[in-house]
A protein has these predicted regions:
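Conserved ABC ATPase "signature" region
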Residues: 58, 73-91, 116
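H-loop (His-switch) and adjacent beta-strand-loop-beta switch element
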Residues: 169-186
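Conserved ABC ATPase signature
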Residues: 95-99
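Conserved ABC transporter NBD signature motif
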Residues: 17-25, 33-34
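Catalytic Walker B motif of ABC-type/P-loop ATPase nucleotide-binding domains
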Residues: 120-124
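H-loop/switch region of ABC-family ATPase nucleotide-binding domains
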Residues: 156-157
Length: 224
C-alpha cells in the first residue's frame, strides 16, 4: 500500500534473484502449471466481447481442462454456487458487460475462487469500487483465504480497508520497502508513525460496531 506513484505493481515482478512457488522457480513452470497454482485479479478484466456471467466464471477452470474439453456439470453447479456466495445469485445468464463495475469485479473474484488456487494476486482490485463493493469484496477474499488455507497478495490504495482486512501490511515509499504493519499486534502509535511518514500526519482510531467488532479508522490530521 502507498500512493499512486509508489510503483506497487512494479514490485509484483522480481528484479533480481529467483522467485519460488511451491518450491519451484517460476521459470521452470509452464503457463498452465502456473495458472493451476496462482489466480490473478486485475483492476479491470479487459473482457469486451459478450459473454454470460457464468461463462466468465467458468474461465477459472481453464487450466484444469484439456484442449477443447468443456466444463463439467459439477463445475457449472459450483460456479453458480460461487456466484450466489459472493452476492450475484440468478445472474449467471446475464451479459457480463451489462454488469456494474462492482458486480464485474465480484464476478472476476468468483472466477478466481472456483479454481481453488493457493495463491491469489490482486492488483488494486478496489480501485473502481464504491464503499459497499470494496468491503464486500475484501470480506469474501478473507473468507476464501481462511477456508482454503490460501495466501492473497493485494496492492491497495485504501489504508483503512487494508488495516481491517489484511494480516500483514507492506508499506512502500517511492518504490522501496518502508516497513510492515500487523494490524492485530502492532501498537497503534507505531502504525501512526509509519503511516504518517508517507501520508502526512494521521491518527488511527479504534471503533466498535453494533456487534462489538473492533475496526481501525485512519484520520487525516492535516489537509494536503
Amino acid at each position: 500500500m502507498r500512493q499512486n506513484y509508489a510503483f506497487k505493481s512494479d514490485c509484483e515482478h522480481p528484479h533480481k534473484g529467483s522467485c519460488l512457488l511451491a518450491e519451484n522457480t517460476l521459470e521452470s513452470l509452464s503457463a498452465r502449471e502456473l495458472a493451476k497454482q496462482c489466480g490473478y485479479i486485475p483492476q479491470k478484466s479487459g473482457i469486451t466481447i459478450d459473454l454470460t456471467v457464468l461463462d466468465v466464471v467458468l474461465m477459472g477452470y481453464h487450466p484444469d481442462l484439456s484442449l477443447l474439453q468443456p466444463p463439467t456439470a459439477q463445475m457449472k453447479e459450483h460456479a453458480k454456487a460461487t456466484l450466489t456466495m459472493i452476492g450475484l445469485p440468478d445472474r449467471e445468464q446475464k451479459n457480463y458487460n451489462q454488469l456494474s463495475e462492482g458486480q464485474k469485479q465480484l464476478c472476476i473474484l468468483a472466477r478466481a475462487f472456483v479454481g481453488t488456487r493457493k495463491l491469489l494476486l490482486l492488483d488494486e482490485p478496489e480501485s473502481a469500487l464504491d464503499f459497499r463493493f470494496r468491503n464486500q469484496m475484501m470480506q469474501h477474499l478473507r473468507t476464501y483465504v481462511t477456508a482454503h488455507d490460501a495466501c492473497a497478495l493485494v496492492t491497495l490504495h485504501d489504508p483503512s480497508l487494508a488495516l481491517n482486512t489484511c494480516d500483514e501490511l507492506i508499506v512502500l515509499s517511492n518504490g522501496t520497502h518502508s516497513g510492515n504493519i500487523s494490524p492485530k499486534s502492532t501498537p497503534v502509535s507505531k502504525m501512526e508513525s509509519l503511516l504518517s511518514s508517507i501520508y502526512g500526519t494521521i491518527n488511527i482510531a479504534k471503533l466498535h460496531d453494533k456487534n462489538g467488532n473492533e475496526h481501525l479508522v485512519m484520520i487525516q490530521e492535516e489537509s494536503i
